[in-house]
Amino acid sequence: MASEAPPFWWDEPDWRALALAPAAWIYGRVSGRRLIRAVPPRVSLPVLCVGNFTVGGAGKTPTAIAFARGAIARGMKPGIVSRGYGGNYSGLHLVDPGHDGARHVGDEPLLLARHAAVALSPDRVKAAEYLKSLGCDFIIMDDGFQSARLHADFSLLVVDASRGIGNGRVIPAGPLRAPLTDQMRKTDALLCIGKGNGADFVIRQAARAGRPIYHAQLRPSSSATVAGRRWLAFAGIGNPDKFYESVRQAGGEVVETHSFADHYSFEPDDIRGLVDMARRQGLGLITTAKDHVRLATMPGVPPEFLSKLAVLDVDLEFDRTDALDHILDTVVERFKSRLHG
């Protein structure tokens, strides 16, 4: 079972954040110093890093998918490097969406592998070189910003507009993976996803640092099956409220919600409980594409449950129509400068 971020991380700082401040200071010193001082190894391919400032969901997966699609549309062959959070693979592995299970490789890599080749490895350089040997000519690094284990020609940091960076404190007092000032120094651009003012502070910091700021929305891609129906919506992702809002945007009525920890491994009792709750209230069951990947590759999940389970997927849409191409151009230009500089 995956661990869940403490709810107080996303509220105003309270006594818990204060009590954990000494530990957060130590963590921040170490993580910030590693980020600033690291000289990551390079590969002879353009590398785009899609990361975020905090633990938890911000929209990295649909962002990585959008860039994979964009690269393919330009005639490129992108490959995605991932650590495979939520799985248990420790070696170098090329994800096979037809045979791999989420418990083995993680749910996000399975989703990403529907769009591009995905190589899993703690050694991101080895993963990138392997993708190059397969003919890939553009690398998308899914997360890995703070670890600094592979040089990125462009680091795009994703933030959720409604949640922002929570209480603004570093782990374990808050959700930040390193002090914001240190992270911003290594950030090339900010992508704010959704509506809301929760990210106003980090947007101001990015503007003050002279970083480009892009905006995008997550649009439901399967509204026809959702609209006009009453749902029990459930999710085991970093920000389940964002998913519930997407169901509403697609025209569905969310009567009940059930949230699980991020990357949650469902048990048979969970499935029975959801089915019983939905049946009692006459509701349909709906979940995320990421949760569906985990459920569909779990042993023992009743086929009738999967056949009746609705899935709402989302696509990333930039507010500026030229934003995605502009970022891809920048990545390639920086790579060429690095190669010939």
From Swiss-Prot:
Keyword tags: ATP-binding, Kinase, Lipid A biosynthesis, Lipid biosynthesis, Lipid metabolism, Nucleotide-binding, Transferase
GO biological process: lipid A biosynthetic process; lipopolysaccharide core region biosynthetic process
Gene Ontology molecular function: any one: tetraacyldisaccharide 4'-kinase activity
Listed SUPFAM superfamilies: P-loop containing nucleoside triphosphate hydrolases (SSF52540)
Catalytic activity: a lipid A disaccharide + ATP = a lipid IVA + ADP + H(+)
Entry's EC annotation: 2.7.1.130
UniProt keyword Lipid metabolism present: yes
Signal peptide from the UniProt entry: none
Source taxon at top rank: Bacteria
Binding site for ATP: T54, V55, G56, G57, A58, G59, K60, T61
Family listed: Belongs to the LpxK family.
Its job: Transfers the gamma-phosphate of ATP to the 4'-position of a tetraacyldisaccharide 1-phosphate intermediate (termed DS-1-P) to form tetraacyldisaccharide 1,4'-bis-phosphate (lipid IVA).
Protein name stated in the entry: Tetraacyldisaccharide 4'-kinase
